[in-house]
Amino acid sequence: MSLDAQTGLLLVVSGPSGVGKTTIVHRVRERLGGQFSVSATTRPKSLAEVNGEDYLFVSPSEFERLKSNDAFLEHAEVFGRHAYGTPREPVENALRDGDLILLDIDVQGAIQIREHMPSAYMIFILPPSDEELRHRLETRGREDEEAIDRRFAEARREIDLATSRTLYDAFIVNDNLDRAVDEACRLVSERRNTTALKG
């Protein structure tokens, strides 16, 4: 049975750093249920993070072993430093069980997911303006000016790439978090109802 024909729904949410996508994904999950896909990464774990909940922290050699065994639906190197990947098995199991599974990944990963799972529903979160995005990156207080400049330039590239192709099913401007969450929930519910009617 092809994974694309399953009753579950794979929701991919992308957007640049600072746009609020992770908060939106968690709020959608709180309201609609489902499972959050935990990505594997080679980056170091921060003190606040929990292995297996926030990320699966693996060594570069373990990541390469998993990649060579086709254990990832998608994988990418981010900011030229650390690798990230979406483990295949939990996603496939959730879809087989008819669940909603949520992925918070970048455009590179979304392109790979679209190739492997054309029925995935993909939403891109946009900032209300470049100025607001820059402000959000600055007020996070996590990085110096050079790192903020790098993230802002990467965010612009990601937005340009996402909006220049027919990869995403919907775009949501996050100018108000509650409205953005409402819109995401509405879109996902409509998609699930449409999928259920076809099944």
Predicted regions and their residues:
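Post-Walker A alpha-helix
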Residues: 24-25
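Conserved lysine of the Walker
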Residues: 21
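NTP-dependent small-molecule kinase module
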Residues: 4, 135, 142-143, 160-199
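ATP-dependent small-molecule kinase phosphotransfer cores
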Residues: 41-101
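P-loop (Walker A) phosphate-binding loop of NTP-binding proteins
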Residues: 14-16
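Post-Walker A helix-loop "phosphate-sensing" segment adjacent to the P-loop in P-loop NTPases
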Residues: 30-38
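Extreme N-terminal, non-catalytic leader segments
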Residues: 1-10
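Conserved phosphate-donor/acceptor-positioning beta-strand/loop module used by diverse small-molecule
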Residues: 101-106, 116-139
